[in-house]
């Protein structure tokens, strides 16, 4: 089974968590693309979706799935999204696709966070994947200096502007032993919109695509 086939298997497995007549929170990325394709097969059973990126919104709408503004929705039963890394505590690094802020907002609203990944994303300690930070443009250099003080090596993601009009710093060389603590420390830096550590809001269910099939971790 290829990596893409493992992603697809995990994505389709998430359908069993979708409740009839509900609005589904939808993330961003290559694995979520498969989930949107899967969701299209049951689109008549759901009200619609809330999306974390313009890219996902366009794909949902291409299938005729209604996309709601989160401000119009008081509750979401599930949010389905991928991860760049995930540890045994279901803490994640996300934001490789630069949609981390909207992802974090929707995941905060959702009752359950369903994380869909292939088995290459499972790690013991977070940090091999550079940690994305969304930053107000004028604060980029200041935030970078503060991140160096925390032991990281921030790199400006050239040419990338988020859907919110901000920039991304990718922080290399972090071995994140205390994700909850670091998430709070980084978010306390003035000029940071949010960071790609999802520790405070960890995944509730992880569906892992493996060569042997989909494994469910809780």
Curated annotation (Swiss-Prot):
Give me the reactions it catalyses. Answer: aldehydo-D-ribose 5-phosphate = D-ribulose 5-phosphate
| Pathway of action | Carbohydrate degradation; pentose phosphate pathway; D-ribose 5-phosphate from D-ribulose 5-phosphate (non-oxidative stage): step 1/1
Q: Which residues bind substrate?
A: 28-31, 81-84, 94-97, 121
Q: Name one GO cellular component term.
A: cytosol
Q: Which residues form the active site?
A: 103 (proton acceptor)
- Pfam families in UniProt: Rib_5-P_isom_A
- Molecular function GO labels: ribose-5-phosphate isomerase activity
Q: List its EC numbers.
A: 5.3.1.6
Q: List UniProt keywords, sorted A-Z.
A: Isomerase
- Which biological process terms from the Gene Ontology are attached to this UniProt entry? D-ribose metabolic process; pentose-phosphate shunt, non-oxidative branch
Q: Which residues form a coiled coil?
A: none
- Group of enzyme by EC: isomerase
Q: Is Cell cycle tagged as a keyword? A: no
- What function is annotated for this protein? Catalyzes the reversible conversion of ribose-5-phosphate to ribulose 5-phosphate.
Q: How does it assemble?
A: Homodimer.
Record-stated family: Belongs to the ribose 5-phosphate isomerase family.
Q: Identify the NCBIfam families for this entry.
A: PRK00702.1, rpiA
What's the name of the protein?
A: Ribose-5-phosphate isomerase A
What organism is the protein native to? Psychromonas ingrahamii (strain DSM 17664 / CCUG 51855 / 37)
Its lineage reads:
Bacteria, Pseudomonadati, Pseudomonadota, Gammaproteobacteria, Alteromonadales
